[in-house]
Amino acid sequence: MLYFRFPFSEDYNFVDENLDKNPVSFHSFDNLEILDFSGEIESISKDEILSAEILSDSLSSKLPLFEEEQQSDYQQKLLKVIDFIKENDLSKLVISRRKLVKYEGSPINLSRTFLNLCKAYPNAFVYFFIKDEKCWLGAFSELLGKFNKKTSEFETMSLAGTIPVHESWTSKEIEEQKPVTDFIKNILNAYSEKVELSETYDHLSGNIKHLRNDFKAQIVREDVEKIISELHPTPAVCGIPKDFCRKAIGKFEKDPRNFYAGYIRVENDDFVQYFVNLRCAEFFQDAALIYVGGGITAESSPEKEWRETELKAEAVLKNIDFS
Ligand SMILES: C=C(O[C@H]1C=CC=C(C(=O)O)[C@@H]1O)C(=O)O
C-alpha cells in the first residue's frame, strides 16, 4: 500500500495495485533498487486513512542487528571526512547517519504519523508505504524535477545549507549551496537554450531553513529521464565529482542509504514529478531508523554537523504517533 500527498494540496492519494500503469516509483540512492506502485492514483479521505489504522505491530519485520552511531564516533568520523575533503580539494561531501527510535512497548500508529507529517509540512511531498516487507514514511519539499507535459517546462531547485530558523547565514552555508546551483545549471544548459534562475532565498522547513534557488527551462519530453539521471544524486545529497563522492560515501557511511536520498517519481495526466527522499524514516515492528545527513565542507564543525542532523531528525520524530 501507498498513501501520498502532493505539496500544497489538501487531498490524500493512494495507488490501487490493480493495473499495468506505474504512476509512482521509489528509487534508491544507489539506483540499484526501484519499488514500483502500479495502478491508478485514487483519492482517499482522512477518515478512511484513520479508520484503516495501521500500527507498527502489524509490520512483518523486526529491526535487523543494528548498532547506532554515537555522537562522539560520528564527530570523530567527520574529522576524517574533513581531512579527506581537504586532501581531495572537494567543495563538499554529504554524509549521513541513522537515528534509532525504539518503541519501548508502545506501538506506533503509522496512519496518524502520516497525517501528522501532512499537517506539519504543507509544502512537502508526504508519503507512507508498506511493500515487500518494507515500511517507509517521509516528508520533504526538495524537487529533483517537475516536467509539465503540456508546456514542456522543466522545473528544479538547488537546496542546501541548514541553520535554525532564527540564525543568520554564514559563508559555510553559502559556499555549500553554490556547487549545487552550478551543477544543476551546467546540466540544464546542455538541454535547453532558455534556463531561468531565481535569486537565492530562504526555504523554511519546520525548525530549520535552507538556501534555495529555482530553475525553469524549456526542454523536450524525450530528455526528461536523461536529465533526471544526470541530476541524481545532486550535490545536495552527494557531492562533486559525483562518482568519486558516491564511492567516498560508501566508504565513510557504515550503513546503506537504501531509499534515503534517492527519489520518488510520480506521474499523472499533467506532470511527471521527482521528489528527493529526505526527512524520511524506515519503520519496523519494534523500532524505526530516521535517516539524516548534511553537507560537510572544509569549514565544517563536527559538533554543529551533529546538531544539524539532530534537528533534521526532529522533523520526523516529533510527528511520530506513539499510540
Ligand atoms: C542531506 C540532507 O539534507 C540536504 C538538503 C538540504 C540541506 C542540506 C544541508 O544543509 O546539508 C542537505 O544538502 C538531509 O536532510 O539528510
What annotation goes with each model-predicted range?
Residues 74-86:
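Structured alpha-helical segments in the cores of large, soluble enzyme domains
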Residues 131-134, 200-208, 264-266:
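A glycine-rich phosphate-binding loop feature that marks nucleotide/adenosyl-phosphate handling sites
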Residues 1-74, 111-113, 127-144, 158, ...:
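Cofactor- and metal-binding active-site motifs of prokaryotic enzymes
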Residues 25, 88, 145, 182, ...:
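A residue-level signal for conserved active-site and pocket-lining positions in enzyme catalytic cores
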Residues 44-72, 78, 102-103, 155-250, ...:
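Contiguous alpha-helical scaffold segments within structured protein domains
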